[in-house]
Each structure stands twice: as C-alpha cells, then as structure tokens.
Amino acid sequence: MAEIGGKNMRKILSLLLALLLSACPAIAEEEEEWTLEDMLADLDAELVADIFINAEEAQSILEAQAEKSIYEADGSVLITITGTGDFTVGGDTRKSSNIWDTELKKHKGDYQFAMKNIRDILLADDLTIVNFEGTLTESTYVPSSKKNNQFLFSAPPEYVSMLTENGVEAVSLENNHVMDHGEDAYIETQTHLSNAGVVWSGGGEIGVIEVKGIQIAMLSYLCIDRYDQLWDTVPANIQAAKELYPIVIVNFHWGNELMYYPTDNQIKMGRLAVDSGADLVLGHHSHRIQPIEQYKGVYICYSLGNFCFAGNSKPSDMTSYLFQTRFRVRGEGEEQQITNEGFIIIPIRISSRADKNDFIPTVLTKESTIDSILNTLKENGRKHCEYAVDEYPLAWPATK
C-alpha cells in the first residue's frame, strides 16, 4: 500500500472539504440526494483510489496524532488542575423572590451569565473541581433538621449545564447544604450530575475521572462536628484509593466561617491526608481565603473562599482566588513517576462589580487589590501554618 505523506494527506482532506462546501449550493437548489461518489465522479481515478484505499491508514494516522497530542516534548503527560471555592447558585424555595432571580432577570433568564468572565480559564485547563454547595432539584421539601436554617439552596436541574458548558468536570458534594432538601434531593442531585458527565464524590462515594489517560481519584469529607468519626476513616480511604489510582485529590469542608486561617483540627486533618497518600488537598467552608501549606511536597489549600456565590448580596470581603497546580506523569505501570510542577493562584473577585455581588466571578487586575490578597495569605501563613508557602506565583513560567 502506498504511503500518504503529510502534505498529500492534507491535500486530500482539503479537497474533500472543498468538494463538500461547493456541493452545498447545489444541494440547496436541487432536492435530489448527493453521494460522495457523485462529488468524486470527475476526479482523476488514481487520486480517488488513493482517497479510498488509504482511508483506513489515514484514520490511523489521525488517531495517532490525536493520541500524541497529550504528550509533552519529553514524552511526559502534563495535567493542569484548577480548584475553586464555593459554587452556590439558585435560590431558596421558601421565598417568593431571591437575590439570584433578581440578577437572572437582568440577563433575560440566561443563567450562564455567571460564568462568562471565568469560563475561558476553566476551559483551558484539564480538570476543574468546585465545591457544589446546594442541590439540583425542584423539591420544596425541607427536613425538620433544616427548618430553622437561614439559608436553603437549590437550583433547577438544568443548571447542571453551568458546569458542563463552562469547563467544570468534577464537584465535591460534602458540605452543609447538599442536604437542604433531604436525602431524595441529594440523590437527585447526584443523578443529574452523573447524567451530565460531571464526576462527583460524597456520601462515602469516590469520584474517578480520567484525564489524558491518567485516572484521578477524588474523595470528599464534611468535617464539621465529625472529626472524631474521621480520624481513622479518612486515612484508610485515602490509602485504599492510592493503591488503585496514581493521583488522589481530597476535598474537606471544615473550619470556621469568616476565618482567614485554619483551625488546629484542619491542620491536623490536612497533614494526615498527605501522610496517608493524598496528592492534593482542597478546603472549603470559611467563605474566606486561607493560606496554602506545602507539606511533604503536597499542597494543602485550607480554604479557597467563595467562587460563584449567590448566598449573599454583598459579602464584606468579595475577594478570593483560583488555585491551579500541575502534575507531570512519566512512564507507565510500576515505572510510572508523578511529580508536582508547582502552583499559581489567580486572584478574583466573586462579582464583576465592587459595590455589590452580581455572582459573576472576575479576574482581578487592580494591583493594590491583588497585593491585599497576597498579603492576607502570607501573613496568616506565617502566623498559623508551619509549612506555609512563602510566595504565591500569579502566572506559569513561559514555555520555552
């Protein structure tokens, strides 16, 4: 079989495309059915033979090129992962109107508005993980344990596309709002996520997502008032996951609200997770940013603050950040080696406006505001975290 060189292959594919495009007006004017053979009828017989005889080989070449594209120049696989803070959209079914609906009307019912300023960042990475703090349900049922809660969060099931359309591939379902409408609504939320292809972990379930051929495991835990139950459970679960998957990420919902530094239990649990085999720890709940530690080479983000947060029309602090890290994978099987390539943070405000929360997370550009975020992280790291990172890079080094 004759070989098709790169230029010849491009020529053939370009020719096919040109033929298809040129046929469009004729197809529109005449309602008769056109076939590929019709379009190739006037071509040189040898060229036509090349096209059909080498179709299988061409497909193999294209598949090989697609597979090759996941590899770096040195043959390794580089995986970029983004972690965000609390994702809370929709409203409270007990109320006739809510702050989310008010903003939604301004955008003519297009609920994708909230992600418009951050979408490109999340689409550009390989995996984005958010803390999904709420439910995907139309249920109005409120458990007796929740009747006195100030906030109950739910969003219509179709809002799952806010994740899939904007580069969010995985969510944690361990927090104090996933049960706002009871067990049935919690299971319904899991179902909507799974049907949409969004990986989730929670309720004792591990989430597994494959990225560039590498399987990544995700575990999630609600620690508030549960530490005594978790000191033995968490390390056992992480160790079991690490035996099966090369990269293990652990989400914790923990700590105190409105605090800029971790509690002793957060620190103890975060380091225990690393000692047990976790490759990355992401924390939530405080609605405020907290420092990052690098413990035994593993990053522990104690709190990523808020992200897309419709729980407050004007939080006293609307600054936050996206955490982004990279893993490099070399080799396969027993020879496989995984190294962390560092991290950056992307400072954001959870609103596109400074005077109120419009639920549109937006990358910050004002230097003084960015400096304030960096100073908050560094100062609280020095005071409260033995292994706090010294610097918070804002951009990846330029590719050589």
Briefly describe each language-model feature range.
Residues 29-400:
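Acidic, metal/ion-coordinating pockets
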